[in-house]
Structure formats: C-alpha cells, structure tokens
Amino acid sequence: MCIRDSAWVGLTEDEAKAKGIAVRKGLMPWAASGRAIANGRDEGHTKLLFDEQTGRIVGGGIVGTNAGDLISEVALAIEMGADTVDIGRTIHPHPTLGESVGLAAEVAEGVCTDVAPPRKR
C-alpha cells in the first residue's frame, strides 16, 4: 500500500459546479516533472481550477510528496485573485516540485510545452 501526501485549498470541481461556476482545469502530471522523476516519486499531480469567466484561480490540489508544503502557493494565488497568466509567468525554479504549480497554470492557459494539450471534446 502507498500512502501519498495530498492537499487541497479553495473549491473542488463539484463545489464549483454546485455554485454555478464553470471551471477550466490545469492538470500537471508529475510523470512530466524532472524533480519528481529524479526523486523516484513521479506518481503525483498538481491540479488547478480557474473560473472560465474571470480566469481567476478558484481552487487547487496537489497529490504527491510534500503536497502540504507545496499548497501554500496555491492558497496565496487564490487570496490574491491570480489568473493563469499571473501564475504561469511567475518564475518557478527548475527542477523543483513547486514548478508544477506554474506548469499546471500553463496547461490551463494552453501554453504548456511540458505535456501534451488536453483533447478537445
């Protein structure tokens, strides 16, 4: 059995839906993270949720090593009303687990070059 760290702040997808907020999701799998791969712990992910109307972050979660230590950037982004561009263009050191927050924002914005873009439905 594997016990992973997990942390969440803000709204979940279900909570946003219940409040009538359409969200855009940015999911960064740690299998594409150089630091997670180097640590041998690439089974996690970072997920950010952005309000479709305003572009502002409304929630985010991290599953993986040190998730509780990494979630503070997401909490600050929510408090500051950050959007995908604010988070994605913030310098994140490489290779770190924390850069997955910036990359998840880039995924939501559609500009991330580290993972394949999500399929259109």
Please identify what each model-predicted range represents:
Residues 1-3:
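Short, small-residue-biased leader/transition segments that mark boundaries at the very start
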Residues 5-121:
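Flexible, glycine-rich terminal cap/loop adjacent to redox cofactors
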